[in-house]
UniProtKB/Swiss-Prot annotation:
Name assigned to this protein: Hybrid peroxiredoxin hyPrx5
Functional note: Thiol-specific peroxidase that catalyzes the reduction of hydrogen peroxide and organic hydroperoxides to water and alcohols, respectively. Plays a role in cell protection against oxidative stress by detoxifying peroxides.
Biological process per Gene Ontology, one example term: cellular response to oxidative stress
Annotated Gene Ontology cellular component terms: cytoplasm
PANTHER family: PEROXIREDOXIN (PTHR10430), PEROXIREDOXIN-5, MITOCHONDRIAL (PTHR10430:SF16)
Domain Thioredoxin: 3-167
Keyword Oxidoreductase part of the UniProt annotation: yes
NCBIfam families assigned: GlrX-dom (TIGR02190)
GO molecular function terms listed in the Swiss-Prot or TrEMBL record: thioredoxin peroxidase activity
Length: 241
C-alpha cells in the first residue's frame, strides 16, 4: 500500500439512500473546491471503528472546522443501508457516511485488501487523509501488520498535522437534571470558557444511582474534567477562579 499524496482522488459515483430515494453522489461533489478529511476503516459497527475511530473524529469536528476543514467523511466498503444504520446508531451528526459498496473508491486509492479470514471479503485498509480541492495533501496509512492496527489514522494525529499549535481540550462531562438552576449555572460557566462538554441528563441518560456511583454524591450538577471530579456549580466556579 503506497501513499497517494499529491494525486487526485479516484473519480467514482457513490450510490446512497437518502430517505426513500436513491441519490448518486460523485467525488467531484464531495471534494471539489473544499478541504476535506477522509478516514476509512474495515467496516461499519466493528469494535475499533465504533468505539474509537469514528467518535473522536465526530468529537473534534468543530475544531477541524475552526482550522478550515469543510467536511469530514468516513468511507467503508459497506452498502448505504448499513452505513445509514451505523450513522443513526452512533449519532455522529458531524460526519458524512459514504458507502463504497463496490470498493471502487477504495481500490482506486490502493487500499482495498482481502479480509477473507474474517469472512469480510474485500475491505478497506484503515487510513486517513487530508484532501484539498480533490488532491490528497497528506495520508496516514496504518502499518502493514497482522490484525487491525490503529496507530496513525486517528483524529488526534490528523489534528496535530493540521494545527500543531492547537491545545486539545480535556474531556468534560456534567450530570444534570431538567429545571435545575445550579445545572444551568454550571453549563453557562463552561460555555463562557468556550469549553465543549457532554451532558448526562438524569431521567434520560442515567439515574441518581450513576451519580452516586461515580461521585459519591446525590445532588446535581456533578462535573468531571479530564477524569477528575470537580463537583457542583460552586466547585466549578472555584476551579476556574
Amino acid at each position: 500500500m503506497s501513499s497517494m499524496e499529491g494525486k487526485k482522488v479516484p473519480q467514482v459515483t457513490f450510490r446512497t439512500r437518502q430517505g426513500d430515494k436513491w441519490v448518486d453522489v460523485t467525488t467531484s461533489e464531495l471534494f471539489d473546491n473544499k478541504t476535506v478529511i477522509v478516514f476509512s476503516l474495515p467496516g461499519a459497527f466493528t469494535p475499533t471503528c465504533s468505539s474509537s475511530h469514528l467518535p473522536r473524529y465526530n468529537e473534534l469536528a468543530p475544531v477541524f472546522k475552526k482550522y478550515g476543514v469543510d467536511d469530514i467523511l468516513v468511507v467503508s466498503v459497506n452498502d448505504t443501508f448499513v452505513m445509514n444504520a451505523w450513522k443513526e446508531d452512533e449519532k455522529s451528526e458531524n460526519i458524512s457516511f459514504i458507502p463504497d459498496g463496490n470498493g471502487e473508491f477504495t481500490e482506486g486509492m490502493g487500499m482495498l485488501v482481502g479480509k477473507e479470514d474474517l469472512g469480510f471479503g474485500k475491505r478497506s485498509w484503515r487510513y486517513s487523509m487530508l484532501v484539498k480541492n480533490g488532491v490528497v495533501e497528506k495520508m496516514f496509512i496504518e502499518p502493514n501488520e497482522p490484525g487491525d492496527p490503529f496507530k496513525v489514522s486517528d483524529a488526534d494525529t490528523m489534528l496535530k498535522y493540521l494545527a500543531p499549535q492547537h491545545q486539545v481540550q480535556e474531556s468534560i462531562s456534567i450530570f444534570t437534571k431538567p429545571g435545575c438552576p445550579f445545572c444551568a449555572k454550571a453549563k453557562q460557566l463552561l460555555h463562557d470558557k468556550g469549553l465543549s462538554f457532554e451532558e448526562i441528563i438524569l431521567g434520560h441518560d442515567a439515574t441518581i444511582v450513576s451519580v452516586r456511583a461515580v461521585s459519591g454524591r446525590t445532588t446535581v450538577p456533578q462535573v468531571f474534567i479530564g477524569g477528575k471530579h470537580i463537583g457542583g456549580s460552586d466547585d466549578l466556579e472555584k476551579y476556574f477562579a
